[in-house]
């Protein structure tokens, strides 16, 4: 895969802090913030300055570095006790994305092995950078594996944003699209707008065009009609949490796409690193679903679009039943027609 289709990094460590591309401002403005305080990292996650399950985990890992730096400076050998509250704040920032808890668990393992009197920053920074670099490597591997499932030159539909903006780099579902496009396996990419935050319209179109990949934007409600027209052979999405049986939580609207894809005999691919799998959950009914503020539905661009007094229901995610998924692609391999037994067979 040539570098020309992978130019964006939404999360980076600068030494002074964690550098985040403010995804709320795209595509109108490209603004980067350097954040030096762990509470501001947690707020950036909650307010969706940074979003996408892998990117959230990476940002949180760097947030732990900032917290440890501050707590050791403040309390010396008592830094671990003060750090506990910071870790709790980070984990509570977004409840559905399991990558957040996974990254924090890795950082906590390093913390537990450090002596109280030692400055923890360098050891924690090494681990945070490993999490970041491993994510990029996993995404590139998933891009290769996902491409092997795509035959000929096809049309694909993707949902939300699952590229470099949502990860450490390259992307999950968009990583497959990037790699397959570079190999001549994809003729046309459709992206749906993804209400209410419009990640498809604002972020996916920006990212693909920035990296030289043509894209066609559709309204969310167009997707089932499009799938019935024969122009799309694969729907390719990411994931925020995958249960042990393959049930997959992803951005709201994914379940409806899976239903429409099955009805029209269009194949459905989920692309996510193994850190997204929650082996403690037997199925998707136990996945916690984040409820976002009603204002996100009742307003658009800061202006009211609904009559005063109307209420709004705003779950951020829904769950795709495993039987509607043709393949789950991870960096460790592909699970076709996922079940608990097939998931366990691949991952042991």
Swiss-Prot record:
<feature type="binding site">
    <location>
        <begin position="51"/>
        <end position="53"/>
    </location>
    <ligand>
        <name>substrate</name>
    </ligand>
</feature>
<dbReference type="InterPro" id="IPR037171">
    <property type="entry name" value="NagB/RpiA_transferase-like"/>
</dbReference>
<dbReference type="InterPro" id="IPR005251">
    <property type="entry name" value="IF-M1Pi"/>
</dbReference>
<feature type="binding site">
    <location>
        <position position="199"/>
    </location>
    <ligand>
        <name>substrate</name>
    </ligand>
</feature>
<feature type="active site" description="Proton donor">
    <location>
        <position position="240"/>
    </location>
</feature>
<feature type="binding site">
    <location>
        <position position="94"/>
    </location>
    <ligand>
        <name>substrate</name>
    </ligand>
</feature>
<comment type="similarity">
    <text>Belongs to the eIF-2B alpha/beta/delta subunits family. MtnA subfamily.</text>
</comment>
<dbReference type="GO" id="GO:0046523">
    <property type="term" value="F:S-methyl-5-thioribose-1-phosphate isomerase activity"/>
</dbReference>
<dbReference type="InterPro" id="IPR011559">
    <property type="entry name" value="Initiation_fac_2B_a/b/d"/>
</dbReference>
<dbReference type="InterPro" id="IPR000649">
    <property type="entry name" value="IF-2B-related"/>
</dbReference>
<feature type="binding site">
    <location>
        <begin position="250"/>
        <end position="251"/>
    </location>
    <ligand>
        <name>substrate</name>
    </ligand>
</feature>
<protein>
    <recommendedName>
        <fullName>Methylthioribose-1-phosphate isomerase</fullName>
        <ecNumber>5.3.1.23</ecNumber>
    </recommendedName>
</protein>
<dbReference type="GO" id="GO:0019509">
    <property type="term" value="P:L-methionine salvage from methylthioadenosine"/>
</dbReference>
<keyword id="KW-0028">Amino-acid biosynthesis</keyword>
<feature type="site" description="Transition state stabilizer">
    <location>
        <position position="160"/>
    </location>
</feature>
<comment type="pathway">
    <text>Amino-acid biosynthesis; L-methionine biosynthesis via salvage pathway; L-methionine from S-methyl-5-thio-alpha-D-ribose 1-phosphate: step 1/6.</text>
</comment>
<dbReference type="InterPro" id="IPR042529">
    <property type="entry name" value="IF_2B-like_C"/>
</dbReference>
<comment type="function">
    <text>Catalyzes the interconversion of methylthioribose-1-phosphate (MTR-1-P) into methylthioribulose-1-phosphate (MTRu-1-P).</text>
</comment>
<dbReference type="InterPro" id="IPR027363">
    <property type="entry name" value="M1Pi_N"/>
</dbReference>
<keyword id="KW-0413">Isomerase</keyword>
<keyword id="KW-0486">Methionine biosynthesis</keyword>
<dbReference type="Pfam" id="PF01008">
    <property type="entry name" value="IF-2B"/>
</dbReference>
